[in-house]
């Protein structure tokens, strides 16, 4: 079955939703929820047991007679280490049937609607929308009519996906709360049902976020804040994660917020759309499941479809990581970057060794298939002229690149049923050895190695050209491993490990690393860093000191806009919850939350608080001397703490060695 846009489990069935012209149709297939049992584990009452072949730990599949019986038994079953529970019944159903959402669809075929709830004083003042055809609509007036109109618009427009920004923390909690208060049903699911909500978590990079997970039967809810956080966890070069900042970062022309959300979704969501076509997960789950968990779902589904037992994960253990680091600091001219194409997936395929408990060899077969599919999509994208079809192929290959690169990480995924820490260690060691070999070739040919990341090297070629060096580097690689010389830069500034700046041929500068562009920095610090780095990259020997002097004078004379001195913080929790945690002693005082509590206007989880520091001494309590930026700008009184900000400028200048000639 193709072009399935959504799937929901019900009593004894999996209900599938398909496009049918401007509407949708449904089809039901039998489904029974299940758990996996180890030998000797008691079978839950009323279950039908199917044996699974192979040497895996969980060798029996117990199917429940009803969803109700499953829900009743789960609390007790979860306590047993000899029972494997898959809480997501849609994942169970897609795993057993082999069906996948969005099969043979393109992202442009999705019916998508964007929304933004405009809050008033503890009420909804308006809801702004972009309909699936891209047309804007605004619901305003009586609050009850706004809420009822929103539900009616969803029913009439029938979107597959509702897209918002920070909607799980702000828009939807307010909408559901006000609808309940006014006793207005939000019956806009494809089954006629309302929104459901539960607490959940997701991980983006090294950060874990709590959020309220909203679901609506037959539809998907995509919060673009989550997608932006996931994007930033990889690229690490976004200064802020609010809509105006993302608009500037991605150079989006739209200003109407729902249209901006729509454009942002078309950049961030296609990779997850195409991942959904491969995995036994809903679109929402694909967006928020980590790569390790997603790949485990894929592996487990293939095993269950073949009637094979599922192994128990290996206990986690430490092992040496990939080769990274900075070799030298300073400014370098004529820098090149070489990259081992898909290093760790290539090493896995080259070695031809599956995880030890992957008896069916599905790991390597799947990696090989996805890699071939990705390369074909990449070739098609290169051959096509600019346009929608090319963008689709680019999104497709990008999505598969992410999935392919997760195979190596899965080996060391603690919760992975097929993890293999010994193999992960071997592959990592081989990668380190290979990169070390490339470094030796570079040094032997007179090149300067500047910075290494997990699969590539920044280097300054030797005088007299790179032809012999390129040939030597390529010859150093084993068969099946390809090296790409993928970029050249007029200059590079290496500050410290994983923190560097690149000057591009067009004059633009790209900063990498938290020390150079962290969101914890105030804007004046970011501007000073950029000025200092630019001076060094462009050969302006006195530029960094000149920038320091200009900023010092401006701060001392209260000439720096307050917005450039302000710090921004996103409230991860509601101010009221912060108050309760503070009273219970489970959190520390926070300037942002203290200001939110005393602001005289409502702040919610997910809102941004911008504040600056007042006072007269360099060392002050920020919490006790913070003032909302909005209040300071309205007052017209310049009460910022110049001593505090001058001390921050001095510390930054010192860290860059501006007065002693260090750091390049």
Description of each model-found segment:
Residues 171-180, 341-355:
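Short active-site loop/helix that positions an aromatic residue
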Residues 467-474, 478-664:
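C-terminal, non-catalytic extensions of nucleic-acid polymerases
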